[in-house]
Regions:
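N-terminal leader/auxiliary helical segments
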Residues: 1-44, 49-230
């Protein structure tokens, strides 16, 4: 999108300690005049964190295995391939989506102007304080609107977009350390998507605590849901 890139700041925020982020969210909520909106966003962040904390050991274990087997595979591409494949699998199984690749993710990002204003102020406050990089509310608004636009853009009813993106990948990947944009699109092939979910519950090793486990991705998803309900 037109404007300054927030990618590096986003990476800093992604690597920040969750406790630091939550502390700044608490600070902001105490100052906010729209506490209900701010609390709602904070609750969503906590739910997202619970899901990542539960599922990421498996995702990174498989990502590392894929990169070890295929040294030229970009680690981010491997990560995206796993997560978007699981999107296809869970949307099909849980929401009975007939064509998961057509699921309207843009339609799940809903807000009115008051909510957008509050979210922009909150994310600006948290990000600026956690990363020590200046991020304005307008920067945040642009990022949120860009996210909605990208979600809409990746809906591919005819298959033409995927074909075009793969052509772009072929041209650009050598200059981007083999990063592939096509990995950001949910796969159409459900059987292929399933292969990334450890449905057979084979043993894998967590890269964090080195413990051997045999959970499937769906097992970890269920555990995250259980933690969220406590």
């Amino acid at each position: 999108m037109i404007g300054k890139s927030m990618r590096k700041i986003g990476s800093l925020l992604h690597r920040a300690k969750p406790s630091d982020i939550l502390d700044k969210m608490r600070e902001y909520i105490n100052l906010s005049e729209s506490k209900d909106i701010a609390k709602s966003y904070a609750a969503g962040f906590i739910l997202h964190y619970a899901l990542d904390r539960s599922c990421h050991p498996y995702v990174y274990a498989l990502q590392n295995k894929m990169v070890e087997k295929y040294p030229h595979l970009n680690s981010h591409t491997a990560h995206n391939t796993i997560e978007f494949s699981m999107d296809t699998y869970l949307l099909t199984k849980r929401l009975k989506a007939e064509n998961a690749y057509l699921f309207d993710t843009e339609g799940t990002i809903i807000f009115n102007e008051a909510e957008l204003d509050e979210l922009a102020k909150m994310i600006s406050y948290v990000t600026s304080n956690v990363t020590n990089k200046q991020v304005t509310p307008n920067d945040v608004k642009t990022a949120i609107k860009d996210l909605k636009y990208i979600q809409k853009l990746t809906i591919d009813k005819s298959g033409k977009k995927e074909n075009l993106v793969k052509i772009i990948d072929g041209i650009a990947a050598p200059f981007l350390n083999n990063f592939k944009f096509s990995a950001l699109m949910r796969p159409k092939d459900l059987e292929k998507a399933k292969k990334y979910g450890n449905i057979e519950r084979k043993t894998w090793t967590s890269p964090y605590d080195k413990l051997k486990r045999n959970d499937s991705f769906e097992d970890l998803f269920e555990f995250a849901n259980l933690m969220q309900s406590i």
